[in-house]
C-alpha cells in the first residue's frame, strides 16, 4: 500500500468519526463580494457570520488603493521581507499603524495566527512561564505551546487566579497573554486589573485586539484605546482582516521588540511577505476608521438594536462588542438552528468544538456597520419565528 493510500485510510477513519459527532466541516464558497448580503449556494442571504465589522472589505476607497498598488508593485512579493519582499508599502503601513496605535513601532505579519505563533516563542522559552486565559484564541494557545515555556492557564477573566499564579510560579520571564474581546463569547477582558497584576509581579503583557480593533475606543484602536492603557501594555496584536476588511496582522510595541521580531519571529522570517497591495488597502482602511467616526457609530447602533431585540426574546445580551453568541449545547442543535435560520434568509454559522468547549455549540452573530435596520430586524424576527432559545 502506498503512503498516499495509508494517509487516505487514516483520513476516512477520522472523517467518519467527525461526521458521527456532528463535527465535520465543509467549505461553502460565496458567489459575491463580502458584505451584509451575500450569494452562497444559489441563495441570497443576510450575512451575520462575517468579521467585516465596519463593512470595509468591499469599500470602493479600500479597493481603489489596492488596485493602484497592484499597478505599481504587481500581485506578489516573491520573497520574505528579509530577502527581496520588502516594499515601501510595508513601511508606510507600519508607520501609519504605529501612529494609529500610539506605539513606538509596529511589525506586520501575514495573519493573526502567524503573529501570535511567532511573537510568543520569540520572547519566552523553556526557562520562562506564560499565563493564558482559558478562553484565549487558538493562535495564542498554539503560540504558548510552541514557546516551550511553562504554560499556566487561568480560569476565564479570573484576575485573582492569575495573580496567584504569577506569585506562585518561579520563572526567568513571565508573560501574560489574553484576548481583549473574546471571539466566541463577545465579552471583554478585565484589562485594568490584568495590567495591575502584571505590574505587581514584573510580568510582560501581550493582548490580542483582533475583535476590538476598529470596534472599540475613541479612535477605533481597540480596548487599550478605550481604557487609555496603550502605554501600559507591552504588546498589542491587531488584525487587518476583520474590521479593517483586508488581510494580515500586526503588533504594536516598543522599537526593541519590533526589531527583535525581525530576527526571532519564525513566521516573519520564513514567510513570503504580505502583498504590497494589501498593505496599501489596509492603510486606506485605517484612514477610514480614524477619519469617519460614523462607521463605528453605525456599527454600535446596530449592536444596541440587536441586543435590545435579543432581550425582548428573553435572551441575555450585553452589548460589549460586535459578537453575540447564542449557546445551544450539542452540535446537532446548533446545526439545526443554523439550517432553520437559513431557510428564513439569515446566514449564521454553527460554531462547534474544538472551536468552543464541548457542550457549548452555538450560533455566533456578528454585527456590521453595513447592516441596515431591516437586516437586524430580519435576524430578530427569524430567531423569534424559529423559536431558537439558549440552551
Curated annotation (Swiss-Prot):
This protein's UniProt keywords: Biotin biosynthesis, Pyridoxal phosphate, Transferase
Catalytic activity, EC: 2.3.1.47
Cofactor(s) needed for function: pyridoxal 5'-phosphate
Protein name as annotated: 8-amino-7-oxononanoate synthase
GO BP annotations, alphabetical order: biotin biosynthetic process
InterPro entries (UniProt xref): Aminotrans_II_pyridoxalP_BS, Aminotransferase_I/II_large, AON_synthase_class-II, AONS_Archaea/Proteobacteria, AONS_Proteobacteria, PyrdxlP-dep_Trfase, PyrdxlP-dep_Trfase_major, PyrdxlP-dep_Trfase_small
Free-text function comment from the UniProt entry: Catalyzes the decarboxylative condensation of pimeloyl-[acyl-carrier protein] and L-alanine to produce 8-amino-7-oxononanoate (AON), [acyl-carrier protein], and carbon dioxide.
Species this chain originates from: Myxococcus xanthus (strain DK1622)
N6-(pyridoxal phosphate)lysine, modified sites: 242
Residues the record lists as binding substrate: 25, 137, 355
GO molecular function, a single term: 8-amino-7-oxononanoate synthase activity
One Pfam family matching this protein: Aminotran_1_2
Gene name as annotated: bioF
Subunit structure: Homodimer.
PANTHER family for this protein: CLASS II AMINOTRANSFERASE/8-AMINO-7-OXONONANOATE SYNTHASE (PTHR13693)
Reactions catalysed, as given in the entry: 6-carboxyhexanoyl-[ACP] + L-alanine + H(+) = (8S)-8-amino-7-oxononanoate + holo-[ACP] + CO2
Lineage: Bacteria, Pseudomonadati, Myxococcota, Myxococcia, Myxococcales
Binding positions for pyridoxal 5'-phosphate per the UniProt entry: 112-113, 183, 211, 239
CDD domains (UniProt xref): KBL_like
Similarity comment text for this entry: Belongs to the class-II pyridoxal-phosphate-dependent aminotransferase family. BioF subfamily.
SUPFAM superfamilies with a match to the protein in the record: PLP-dependent transferases
Known pathway: Cofactor biosynthesis; biotin biosynthesis
Record bears the keyword DNA-binding: no
PROSITE patterns: AA_TRANSFER_CLASS_2
